[in-house]
Structure formats: structure tokens, C-alpha cells
UniProtKB/Swiss-Prot annotation:
GO terms for cellular component: cytoplasm. Keywords: Amino-acid biosynthesis, Arginine biosynthesis, Cytoplasm, Transferase. This is Ornithine carbamoyltransferase. Its EC number is 2.1.3.3. Belongs to the aspartate/ornithine carbamoyltransferase superfamily. OTCase family.
Amino acid sequence: MQPFYKRHFLRLMDFTPAEIAHLLALSTKLKADKKNGIETRRLQGKNIALIFEKDSTRTRCSFEVAAYDQGAQVTYLGPSGSQIGHKESIKDTARVLGRMYDGIQYRGYGQQIVETLAQYAGVPVWNGLTNEFHPTQLLADLLTMQEYLPGKALSDMTLVYVGDARNNMGNTMLEAAALTGLDLRLVAPKACWPDAGLVAECQAAAKQTGGSITLTEDIAAGVAGADFIYTDVWVSMGEPKETWKERIALLKPYQVNMAMIAATGNPQVKFLHCLPAFHDDQTTMGQQMAEQYGLHGGMEVTDEVFESAHSIVFDQAENRMHTIKAVMVATLAQD
């Protein structure tokens, strides 16, 4: 029986550096097996519940395709498709679903919700995104980085995240750096830095792996020598519009544009984004931003960068599926 069997996947820091490396290696193998048409279905007869309190494209599709590839069946419970937290407590929901399903994915709000599900379900629970952490995304990011710099260890790579770093992406990048030895730089206004306690915890852990975690407002110094530039949206649909103007004004200097790409001094630097991205005005929200704030060429990233050879965001998006598959196989398959 392998060491991941029946374990939860709630946040990266629940695992050792060796375990994260194992999941990445398994992801690589599963991706190659699928491409070569030799994938072994190790989840035949398994039933998986997908709880989504927040809608999603990539996470839902990744879990569903990964499950089907491996022979499992899924039940999708959308924002209006379950009684969780409304008529039925999280604890009770966990105990009901745990009797019917072999694994449960949760994407929604507080980390405490997914932790409670894990405490009471009796089956593996996987965090598809909470307000605090997004571990399946970072697993895909690390795989993508390995693929684009095959001659380098993660511990020899420099990842720069620019923009709003006080969110689940910033938090999870801190944990990823601590576990892999990355040179991580969070380049953001101080008002957008992650929780100081988590930063200190991850900086201490990074000393054991040779990692480096830097927080700075200095864009030029922060991006110099980067292997990868990463950003995320500045505003989300659920946030009150009154906050948008102030947030955009605060973060506008941190937009990923060709000047920032050039400032890295690395002509091979790659651009990452967890998507969706506001890089043009071809969406309802993109049009709003263009009309109200004059952001016609993109918000957190310009369309020029997004569509350039630097951008590897669609390889990154594909890798969500392969890494999620690895997590499910590792935690549900006995051999």
C-alpha cells in the first residue's frame, strides 16, 4: 500500500518535499501514459463527489476528465445543488457523502469548511480552492515549470508573483516555495502582502530546502532574473464594485506588460496565470474595466504579453487535469 492512500489533499504544507516531488513525478507519468494511449484505469468502480460552492471551469473539467480517464464516476453538486451549510451542517454533509462516495472534492469558501469535511467524511477530501489556499493549482504550476526548464531543479528556479499577493495564490506559493526550495519573490504593494505569520512559517521551512522567500514593492529588483512571471486577477466578481477603483489604482504599476518582461533581463522568461485573465475587453467584465478605468489593453496582464511566446498559460491550464489526476490516483488507488 502506498503512502498517499486514503490521505486528504487540503494544503501543500501537509506534505513533505519528497511527497510533493512524488506527486509531480506521478503527474508526469500519467500525462505521458494518456498521450501514448497506454493509461491504466486505476479508479474503476470509484465514485467521486464534486462540491462546488463557487463556479469553475478548469477545476470542474479537470476533476471530471481525470476521473473519467481513470474509470471513476462523478456527481457534480453546484452552488445550488446541495444543502451544505444551509439546511445541513458541513459535519452532517461529510458523514452522508462519505457513506456514498470514495472521495470528495470541495471548492468554495473558508479553509475550515474543507478541513471539517475531511475530519468527518471518512474518505479522502481534496481542496479544489478555498479563500485561503489553492493547492491543486500550485501543483499544476510546478509541473509546468519543470516542463519548461527540464535541465533545472525547482530549487534552482526563480518564480516572481506580481500583483495582489494576499490571496489564496500568494499563500499557496509561499508553501510551494518552502517545500521545493524555489526562489520566490512576491512583488506587491505592502497592503497586498500575505499574512505575516504564514510568511514567517514558510520562510523558516524554506531554510530546510534551500528556498528563498522575498517580499518587496520594488518591481525592478523583484523581477530581475526571473524564470517565470506570474499574476492573477486584481478584482473578483464577488467583490463590491466600490473597492475596484482603489484596488486598480494601487495595482496598476504591477501590471505584467512587455516593459516588465524586458526588465527581467531574461529573453526566455515565461508568463503564468491561473486564469481566467482580464487581458482584453472580450468579456463582460473586461468591457466594464475598459470603459470605467481605461484598461483597454488588459488589466493585470496586457493582451500583448498574454498572446506572446512568453505565455504558457494554456499548457499550465492543461496540467491542472494531469496533476489532479495524480492526486486522485495517489489517494484512492491502493497499489
